[in-house]
Amino acid sequence: MTETVAGKAAGEKRDLLILGGGLVGMTLALAAATRGISSHVVDRADPAELTAEGFDGRASAISTASWNLFTNIGIAQRLEPLGCPIESIAVTDQMKPGRIDFRPEPHEGTLGRMFANRDLRLALFEAAAQQPLIAWHPNARVTDRDRSEHGVSATLADGTVLRAELLVGAEGRASPTREESGLGLAKWGYGHRAIIAGLAHERPHEGVAWEIFYPAGPFALLPLRDDSDGRHRSALVWTVSEKDAAGVMALSPRAFLAEVTRRMGDIYGTVELTGDRSSYPLSFQHTARMTDHRMVLVGDAAHGMHPIAGQGLNLGLRDVGALVEVLGEARRLGLDLGDAEMLRRYETWRGLDTFSVSFATDV
């Protein structure tokens, strides 16, 4: 949606006020639109920066359930040629003999698809721009949130006031909406950081995702599609201790690749970097509740986990699927979308799943 159209829609009271227009927040807006539910989507980031080449080297494993959701909101066809099927997962202890392979039965298809986060953002943003039920407000900072008996509102830094029936916190781990609500949060750090890098390599990966365990943490290689030049590619997620992270990031490209090769052996032959490296701290967090008066949390705003199982985004997308089902039922029954009983249904539906998956991946 263009800035002009979003500006015209600013005065309209919409059904949802989604704060956070990332992968989970924008998917929610698109999924809600399939049920005729309108939304304001507010994000402080610049879409041009988020979709720029080299901005974010991260990639995500998309499960079958998440792929079905993408199909329902109309972006699967655009994404299909950009994804790489995960045919199997190889797990090994420091490349020692005794590798374990997890491979689905022939009738089960693949273990998921790998996508660069940039490609996911581009598909979501393009779809949102074409959806009249979504008023998108990028480059916008929220200065005030209000929840009353009759609705919710958010005031932006430029004085614009957005109104809706239900407030959705989708800003990620540091969600201001969650913090302002006072919901309890269990949180602890792991004392590790994930080093992220894109690799090009001599030999094809054949759809294999590698999980190589070292004392300091897992070293993962996730298969990506070959690039336009035909280079075989993988995404690297290398877990290092917090005390070693700065040193690893400071290594020259040549020294960094030498360390990478030492840990992955010769499985892909010669490797090279395809872009800049990045790193982020690893931690666990989970809210005591995912709902409050006229408010719900989705994605990392409600739960954040170790990336070892690659389930963080998929868990957030399951939040989206459940919330849209609940909201669709509320709309069918003629209820206010902020109805407390309907929100309790979402809380009950998602609470056990998010709690069990989060703790199962707590390392």
Label every PLM stretch briefly:
Residues 246-341:
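FAD/FMN-dependent oxidoreductases across multiple families
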Residues 11-12, 71-72, 82-180, 188-193, ...:
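Conserved N-terminal helical subregion
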Residues 14-41:
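N-terminal Rossmann-like FAD-binding beta1-loop-alpha1 element of flavoenzymes
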Residues 33-56:
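Glycine-rich FAD pyrophosphate-binding loop
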Residues 24, 47, 174:
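Conserved Rossmann-like nucleotide-cofactor binding loop
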Residues 325-363:
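C-terminal helical "tail/cap" subdomain of flavin- and related membrane-associated enzymes
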Residues 70, 151-155, 161, 166-277:
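Conserved FAD-binding catalytic core of PHBH/FMO-like flavoproteins
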Residues 56-80:
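N-terminal glycine-rich dinucleotide-binding loop that anchors FAD/FMN and/or NAD(P) in oxidoreductases
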